Amino acid sequence: MSYYDLKKAANGDDKTTLEDKHVPVIDAPDKVKKGEYFEVKIKMGEGIDHPMEEKHFIQYVELYADYYQLARVNFTPEMKAEVALTIKLEESCTLRAYEFCNIHGQWEAAKEITVD
Ligand SMILES: [Fe+2]
């Protein structure tokens, strides 16, 4: 499901903590109406904030509807690594969020969404 740097684990980082800090969390309705705007919030990490420092930060997050890229948001260390996007869909799909940490690489999350 997600890229994971084994070398980092050998150096003492706990895999679970790394996942908690990196796997994006997609907050969106399970069901929406065709063609109607709704909000998708993405935050990086569950219950723990990822560092946003010059040497270690989330560089970007991308949102896909199946294989179609809906958005890409670039972050700087001055920002909080979360975003709210307003989108509309024409058919049911899997929303996927890919976030990229400059040290720990790419992490993915997915959420099924039904369009009526
Ligand atoms: Fe990281």
What are these model-derived regions, one by one?
Residues 81-85:
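Short strand-edge motifs at loop-to-beta-strand transitions and within beta-strands
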Residues 43-53:
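Short amphipathic, basic-aromatic surface patches that mediate peripheral association
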Residues 4-32:
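Short, compositionally biased P/S/T/A/G/V-rich stretches that sit at domain boundaries
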Residues 32-45:
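Contiguous beta-strand segments within globular domains
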Residues 112-116:
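Short beta-strand edge segments in extracellular beta-sheet folds
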Residues 37, 92-94:
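Extracellular Ig-like/FN3 beta-sandwich strand-entry sites
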Residues 53-59:
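Short coil-to-beta strand junction motifs in C2/discoidin
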Residues 100-110:
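Short acidic/polar inter-strand loop motif in beta-rich domains
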